[in-house]
Amino acid sequence: MWAPGVAATLTYDIATPAVIALQIAAARRPDDEALTTTVDGAPVAITEVAGSGGPLGGRTHLVTCGRGQLVVTYAGNGPSPAARAIAPTAFDRIVALRPSRYCPSDRLVGYAARYRRGDDLATVRAIVADVHDSLVYDATATGPTTDAIDTLLAGRGVCRDYAHLTVALCRAVDVPARVAAVYAPGLDPMDFHLVAETALADGWLVWDATRLAPRQSLVRVATGRDAADVAFGTVLSGTAQLVGMAITAVADGDLPTDDHDGLVRLP
């Protein structure tokens, strides 16, 4: 188990008093972490939403602030070596089979049939390999409304598009799948990252069709049906514009080697 150190700094210009929901803290509360918020250099309160943590979510924090420049800073270590992955429940599997906003799997059933193999693991591996081989990583080819079908037709996208297409195709062949927002040591350029997870046997297996970072050192931030559930920042009221973001994720020692075909579980 690699225990990376992670950090994020988000800068918002607040034009009118705003309430912002943030999901940037590690889902498994680290032994050592700090989360601070300031507006024009003066501290403002940030609170963790009660009940927001859990196997299917991440820890959500709320900040209420007036006009000015809001700076949110988070730093923490990764999960402890003793942290264990959480097995899917029956309800988890049901939720992870349903179509969702960015993963309209019900519209891909006929197309996805080509990936069926002798068992679910072989089917998932075929899907992940084909998503990797058929898409071009292109940050200019995607937007906030792009869903898995848009990505399939365009043949290009970013990490969230790779994850959405992987998840949608898995659900279309009756394999429960979800997304996980993560810190990703080794990612270049550094950013928040989105990967897919499938419920196979007694655990959630993580897949990254971009192959841009080793899965063994990923640090879970939030988990959900698709990107709508795991957004790092959501303006709930007021007027706020994200004007800056800096992400850091560092492994403890050398990065692990990942062939992106083996079985990896995230705590």
Regions found by a protein language model. Give the residues of each.
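Intrinsically disordered, low-complexity N-terminal segments that are enriched in acidic
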Residues: 1-81
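Generic structural "secondary-structure junction" signal
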Residues: 22, 137-139, 154, 185, ...
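Intrinsically disordered, low-complexity acidic/polar segments
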Residues: 17-20, 31, 81-85, 205-207, ...
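Hydrophobic/aromatic-rich core segments of domains that either
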Residues: 129, 161-239
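Secondary-structure boundary elements
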Residues: 14, 82, 93-157, 165, ...
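Short flexible/disordered coil segments
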Residues: 21-23, 198-213, 238-259
